[in-house]
Amino acid sequence: MIDESPYRLQLWLYPLLLLTLCGSVQGDDMHLRDTFTGKPQERWRFVTDQVMGGVSTGNLRFEALQRQNFARMTGNVSTKNNGGFIQFRRQMTAVSGSNGVEIRVRGNGEKYFVHLRTSGTVLPWQYYQASFDTTDEWKTIRIPFRNFVGSSDWLSENVSPPSIRSLGIVAYGRDHQADIAVSMAGFF
């Protein structure tokens, strides 16, 4: 009689190994650049100031043009009722040694913001913020972490890359029409 136990063990180990490897790839995806391929609607979330009584409106669409995928956020930002933002964000972590945020954008000439939330931003209105300007041409923008400013004095002065939990693209702080497209968001 042949002992089949080693074969049973191998049959059991292969699926376990495959699941482990797939899990690692998904986990690594949280700190890679997002180029809005696959199912970006499952990674990115659209939020307005209506969650706190504001009246800003907008939407987020995922589009493709000339083999380039991108997210496009449009809307009306209103500061009425202590509001003033629309945004889209996703969970994303930076690896140790990252120096900043890198995005590829085009827009309607308005100023926009990148918001980072970290393990230290526990209240909904806490974030680190840096601004950038858009044009109607695609351009890559790099924003060093040292340029991000905390939304309150309670936050640490500097952003620590391993503490980053999410990245958001935000139209914020003044009455205006938002129209911004992002084809890549991540860290450098």
Question: Each PLM stretch: what is its role?
Answer:
Residues 1, 18, 151:
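Short regulatory "switch" loops immediately downstream of catalytic or recognition motifs
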Residues 3-14:
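Bacterial N-terminal signal peptides that target proteins for export
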